[in-house]
A protein has these predicted regions:
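FIC/Doc superfamily catalytic core
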Residues: 1-105, 109-173
Length: 173
């Protein structure tokens, strides 16, 4: 079900890529992703809303559920103040989003959908993290504050793969 829902999310991103990124859009993506899944049957799981219970990523704590709305509001305010958005801005938003980890589950998928949205919105060639790049990608996220080049270089490589596909299908970028 989540695979079908993920395609619905991609359609939503494409349809709304020129819209300003808002909490409403982000929550709607989560609702699209998690509707009619086993998670949606759990009374403690908030489909389309922020987490109710604390969670962690790779053993690291994330934002307390009571603070998520405030943190997301601040993240979006800072992002939406940018006059011109580049790849590093998109990646920084993603890393901060992952650290907040606003939803009980699905944060990585929602975060990657948001990067796709931001790339489309800002005329940045999108990218897909393939299995062969996953370790470098995860290392880049973990080391973002010290050496953001790890993640940037990994995503630039992924962009090169994406460009090859665009060229193959004669799609201008």
């Amino acid at each position: 079900m989540e695979t079908v829902n993920h395609f619905r999310c991609i359609d939503y991103v494409i349809d709304h890529a020129t819209d300003k990124l808002t909490e409403t859009h982000i929550k709607h993506l989560h609702q699209l992703l998690k509707t009619n899944t086993s998670d949606s049957q759990k009374e403690w799981f908030a489909v389309g809303d922020y987490k109710k219970l604390a969670n962690e990523v790779g053993g690291e704590g994330t934002t307390d559920p009571k603070e998520v709305h405030k943190e997301m509001k601040q993240l979006l305010a800072e992002y939406n103040l940018l006059k011109q958005v580049n790849l590093d801005d998109v990646l920084n938003f993603y890393v901060q989003f992952e650290r907040i980890h606003p939803f009980q589950d699905g944060n990585g998928r929602i975060g990657r959908l948001l990067m796709f949205w931001q790339c489309l919105q800002n005329n940045i060639v999108p990218f897909i993290i393939t299995e062969d790049l996953r370790l470098y990608y995860n290392r880049g996220i973990q080391n973002w504050d010290r050496i953001n080049g790890f993640l940037t270089d990994t995503c630039l490589t992924a962009q090169d793969y994406y460009k090859e596909h665009l060229q193959y299908f004669s799609i201008k970028f």
